[in-house]
A protein has these predicted regions:
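Pro/Thr/Ser/Gly-rich low-complexity, intrinsically disordered linker/stalk tracts
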Residues: 1-27, 64, 76-120, 165, ...
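Intrinsically disordered, low-complexity N-terminal tails
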Residues: 34-39, 50-54, 69, 73
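Beta-strand-rich modules
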Residues: 57-81, 160-182
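Extracellular low-complexity, O-glycosylation-prone stalks/linkers
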Residues: 25-47, 121-140
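Solvent-exposed serine/threonine-rich low-complexity stretches and specific carbohydrate-binding patches
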Residues: 45-55, 137-148
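An aromatic-rich alpha-helical recognition segment common to small helix-rich domains
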Residues: 20, 33, 59, 68-72, ...
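C-terminal, beta-strand-rich globular interaction domains
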Residues: 144-149, 157-165, 176-180, 184-191
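Short S/T/G- and acidic-enriched coil/turn segments that sit immediately N-terminal to beta-strands
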Residues: 53-58, 111, 145-159
Length: 195
């Protein structure tokens, strides 16, 4: 069972997505999804939030900053229910607040990006694009800091290229509670122009 919380302002998306391995039993009817705010819980009818036929569920009845814990069971035609799965938890973080550069601001080719810390975030990733919706050109590392410097982008092989003067670029920050920077929340998008 895997749970990933997401708070993505651009998509007006606040949810925790649950995925698990399918049960191969011939008489399988579906799955029951249980949720609690306590890590060690026993699946009971008062904690049942959904019955689904496929091994995926999107929980949209969540609040930002609350950790939710989930277990899933399988049930068959005779209404026999399996034991609860290994638990998983998800958390939708508050949106990162971008500090600079902000819309309309001039920046150097080695732009320093900064944002306010997000409670619960373990890492951040800055995404720089050539349009509001596509054209990612950044390859900055994950950071636990609330600043990052754009030193250049890789264009071919290992050669680095700076941001181009007089061009407008867009940026956002992804905050994560998981290893590898899986997105839990994505900031609004700001733009800036390179001097």
């Amino acid at each position: 069972l895997r749970a990933v919380g997401r708070n993505i302002s651009l998509l007006d998306q606040l949810e925790i997505a649950l995925d698990w391995a399918a049960n191969g039993e011939a008489d399988l009817v579906g799955y029951r999804v249980y949720r609690s705010v306590n890590a060690s819980f026993t699946p009971t009818s008062d904690l049942l939030i959904a019955e689904v036929e496929t091994p995926r569920y999107i929980d949209r009845a969540i609040e930002v900053g609350t950790s939710y814990y989930y277990q899933v069971t399988a049930f068959d035609r005779g209404n026999k229910e399996s034991a609860g799965s290994v638990g998983a938890n998800g958390l939708a973080l508050p949106l990162p607040e971008l500090v600079e550069p902000i819309t309309g601001q001039l920046a150097s080719a080695q732009t320093v990006f900064s944002w306010r810390p997000v409670s619960g975030a373990l890492s951040y990733r800055v995404i720089v694009t050539t349009s509001p919706t596509s054209g990612e050109i950044s390859d900055m590392e994950l950071t636990a800091d609330t600043t990052a410097v754009f030193n250049g982008r890789t264009v071919s092989g290992s050669s680095q290229e700076a941001l181009e003067s007089s061009e407008i670029y867009y940026w956002k920050v992804i905050a994560s509670t998981r290893d590898g920077g899986v997105e839990n929340s994505v900031s609004a998008i700001e733009n800036f122009k390179v001097r």
